[in-house]
From Swiss-Prot:
Oxidosqualene cyclase that generates friedelin, a triterpenoid product with the maximum number of rearrangements possible. Friedelin is probably required to coat the leaf exterior as defense compound against pathogens or herbivores. This is Friedelin synthase. Expressed only in the epidermal cells on both sides of the leaf and not in internal leaf tissues. PROSITE patterns: TERPENE_SYNTHASES. It comes from the Eukaryota. Keywords: Isomerase, Repeat. One of its GO terms (molecular function) is intramolecular transferase activity. GO terms for biological process: triterpenoid biosynthetic process. Gene3D superfamilies: 1.50.10.20. Its EC number is 5.4.99.50. SUPFAM superfamilies: Terpenoid cyclases/Protein prenyltransferases. Belongs to the terpene cyclase/mutase family.
Length: 767
């Protein structure tokens, strides 16, 4: 049976940590764990997911939950409540539902204080890792038979009905998703006609029916070239010489969004080396299976710009293709021949590897994300197959695995801090401190231990990095990459804890470390008042014309986001109340400019585009709460009025809200099919309206939403998993499995606190 291990480093001599592995979560298969009741529950969960896989795509993340609830012998002692038709929401009902949710999810807290959860969904994370391990000869070392079984399960369970696989689990079939998962199945031992429900042959048919693997997007062409399944001449150039350009040039990698920079750094190294793995009999078979014509007859030059229409979200501008053609026809032939291959190319490759090693070391070999991790690991192996750099990479591979009832998948890199900071705020809003003292104290300790204590090593600015001391990451401290919203949410938690008795929640974070966090936030704010995610924004927008991907938008440079801006405004408003003299003018200016940014980016219909959640509902919650924190109200701010009207206009008959992920790529509000409600989105809308003062005007929409949340709660205090709620870069969904608990609990807590308990619809219990 699979078991989730918390804050363990194991005995691997090549792994190291900055905080004793707080937040680390790894899965191990325990052959001795054979409890028949637990095994039966796991098998039932798998079967239930399989039977409903085309209706509810994200997992309910049940394996670790079953484990933790069993280990803690959790029993729900508060009776389930329902609000009947025509009945008003009572104080007792709201309180009971809230307490049931809090007790249930508190029981799922890990030993180090964080809340584990799946954070996955893209269908292009696992295959590159499998290819990398196949190339390096470590596939059988890392992938046990149990790893193979669960990885294949995930692929089978997320195959679309037409035989293909999507860019992400909610999406239509794409060439990128289908080719990568096809290769993954074959490398893991499936034959050409193998796989559950004829998965392999159905996938191959989809590929060939849609033009074959030469129509895969550019990232796919790179991996196929590495695998010997395409020729490098079928790829657009990724010259490592970009790293030799003067940093003041607009197209220098230093100007890129960090994820873009971190993807093309190892890609450019592998391209510059023209690395291709040893051609095995299996690769020769795959050449025959994936292409519509014999491999040696393919005109690779003609397929460089070919991309399957199902994959194309961001078509390349003509200008970009002209640039690639110029590099392809003139620059690359020169740089790959003597003497420039010695004078320039080798120097560029060394410079690129210097940056790779720097980034690896400063993330403890976790690297910034799943895509980048595998590319950097392969680059280290290509440089030195027996070197310590590669061995350190191998030691951190388990950090990316996640196992649920739908199988094994690769996480983005983990949402440990993000989920924990949100749930802490939900707990504090519940006003249940006396019942959850231990839970709060452990969470407080985890958040304090997860703060980044130092900037990147050495002369970090010369490595195109920025300050991180005082920040929080998305996952854990070892990851190292600062994030503005994660920093703001962590700061909010620490400030709220500082208002509580230390004998209850532990010692408050020292003011100096709070000041470090404030420094990060002040450093990152843009001139327009908005907040970027990772690094300062402000580079020229025209650089987005050079976006080399076909399936993402706005990935070349850093941008400002409504969510990051709101989180930072909320955090600094609270900080200003508690530390009114610290950098007072800067903090006040930040809040003023941040609020103005939130007003300025509002859409004409009153909505805000959410960048990291689905979508306009998510953006509206953040914007309205941020504006409220800055002193903007329904009466004094037109943006608040328009935002409230937007949410009220899309409320559904059952009192909920339900928005399709399709809103994200379409950039317009798209309701869920059949006007279904989604509990997570209902919670966002409910909180947004409450912070906008809706309870003082007409609480009826709030009571209707609360009724839906209360009536949807399950018998044990959990909430049902519904449609995916997370997204990134407009076109790829991301499953935050913790959201289905965090946000309904938080919304009920805020509802109970701010919807006047003496009103007609929600009343205090009679004495």
């Amino acid at each position: 049976m699979w078991k989730l291990k918390i804050a363990e480093g194991g005995s691997d001599p090549y792994i190291y940590t900055t905080n004793n592995f707080v937040g680390r979560q790894i899965w191990e298969f325990d052959p001795q764990a054979t409890d028949p009741q637990q095994l039966a529950k796991v098998e039932a969960a798998r079967l239930n997911f399989y039977n409903h896989r085309h209706k509810i795509k994200p997992s309910s993340d049940l394996l670790w939950r079953l484990q933790f609830l069993e280990e803690k012998d959790f029993r729900q002692n508060i009776a389930q409540v329902k609000v009947e038709d025509g009945e008003e929401v009572s104080y007792e009902a709201a309180t009971a539902a809230l307490k049931r949710g809090v007790h249930f999810y508190s029981a799922l807290q890990a030993s180090d204080g964080h809340w584990p959860a799946e954070n996955a969904g893209p269908m292009f994370f696992m295959s590159p890792l499998v290819m990398c391990l196949y190339i390096t000869g470590h596939l059988n070392t890392i992938f046990t038979e149990e790893h193979r079984r669960e990885t294949l399960r995930y692929i089978y369970y997320h195959q679309n009905e037409d035989g293909g696989w999507g860019f992400h689990i909610e999406g239509q079939s794409t060439m990128f998703g289908t080719v990568l998962n096809y290769i993954c199945m074959r490398l893991l031992g499936e034959g050409p006609e193998g796989g559950q429900d004829n998965a392999v042959s159905r996938g191959r048919k989809w590929i060939l029916d849609h033009g074959g693997a030469t129509a895969i997007p550019s990232w796919g062409k790179t991996w196929l070239s590495i695998m010997g399944l395409c020729d490098w001449s079928g790829c657009n150039p990724m010259p490592p010489e970009f790293w030799l350009l003067p940093s003041y040039l607009p197209m220098h990698p230093a100007k890129m969004w960090c994820y873009c920079r971190m993807v093309y750094m190892p890609m450019s190294y592998l391209y510059g080396k023209r690395f291709t793995t040893h051609i095995t009999p299996l690769i020769l078979q795959l050449r025959e299976e994936l292409h519509t014509q014999p491999y040696d007859q393919i005109n690779w030059k003609k397929v460089r710009h070919v991309c399957c229409k199902e994959d194309t979200y961001y078509p390349h501008p003509i200008l970009q293709d002209l640039i690639w053609d110029t590099l392809y026809l003139t620059t690359e032939p020169l740089l790959t021949r003597w003497p420039l291959n010695k004078l320039i190319r080798e120097r560029a490759l060394k410079k690129t590897m210097k940056h790779i090693h720097y980034e690896d070391e400063n993330s403890r070999y976790i690297v910034i994300g799943a895509v980048e991790k595998v590319l950097c690991m392969l680059a280290c192996w290509v440089e030195d197959p027996n070197g310590d750099y590669f061995k350190k990479h191998l030691a951190r591979v388990p950090d990316y695995f996640w196992v649920a009832e739908d199988g094994m998948k690769i996480q983005s890199f983990g949402s440990q801090h993000w989920d924990t900071a949100f749930f802490v705020q939900a707990l504090l809003a519940s006003d249940m401190t006396d019942e959850i003292r231990t839970t709060l104290a452990k969470a407080h300790d985890c958040i304090k231990k997860s703060q980044v204590k130092d900037n990147p090593s050495g002369d970090f600015r010369s490595m195109y990095r920025h300050i991180s001391k005082g920040a929080w990451t998305f996952s854990d401290q070892d990851h190292g990459w600062q994030l503005s919203d994660c920093t703001a949410e962590g700061l909010k938690c620490c400030l709220l804890f500082s208002l509580m008795q230390p004998e209850v929640v532990g010692e408050a974070m020292p003011p100096e470390r709070l000041y470090d966090s404030v420094n990060v936030l002040l450093y990152l704010q843009s001139k327009n008042g908005g907040m970027p995610g990772w690094e300062p924004a402000g580079e020229s927008e025209w650089l987005e014309l050079l976006n080399p991907t076909e399936f993402f938008e706005n990935i070349v440079i850093e941008h400002e986001y409504v969510e990051c801006t709101s989180s930072a405004v909320q955090a600094l408003v609270l900080f200003k109340k508690l530390y009114p003299l610290h950098r007072r003018k800067e903090v006040e200016r930040f809040i003023t400019n941040g609020a103005k940014y939130l007003e300025d980016i509002q859409m004409p219909d009153g909505s805000w585009y959410g960048n990291w959640g689905v979508c306009f509902t998510y953006g509206a919650w953040f914007a309205l709460e941020g504006l409220s924190a800055a002193g903007k109200t329904y009466n004094n701010c037109a943006a608040v009025r328009k935002g409230v009207d937007f949410l009220l206009n899309i409320q559904l008959e059952d009192g909920g809200w339900g928005e399709s992920y399709q809103s994200c790529p379409d950039k317009k509000y798209v309701p869920l099919e059949d006007n279904r409600s989604n509990l997570v989105q209902t919670s966002w809308a409910l909180m947004g309206l409450i912070y906008a003062g809706q309870a003082d005007r007409d609480p009826t929409p709030l009571h209707r939403a609360a009724k839906l949340l209360i009536n949807s709660q399950l018998e044990d205090g959990d909430f049902p998993q519904q449609e995916i709620a997370g997204v990134f870069k407009m076109n790829c969904t991301l499953h935050f499995a913790a959201y289905r608990n965090i946000f309904p609990i938080w919304a009920l807590a805020v509802y109970r606190r701010f919807c006047n308990p003496n009103s007609e619809a929600i009343s205090k219990p009679s004495k």
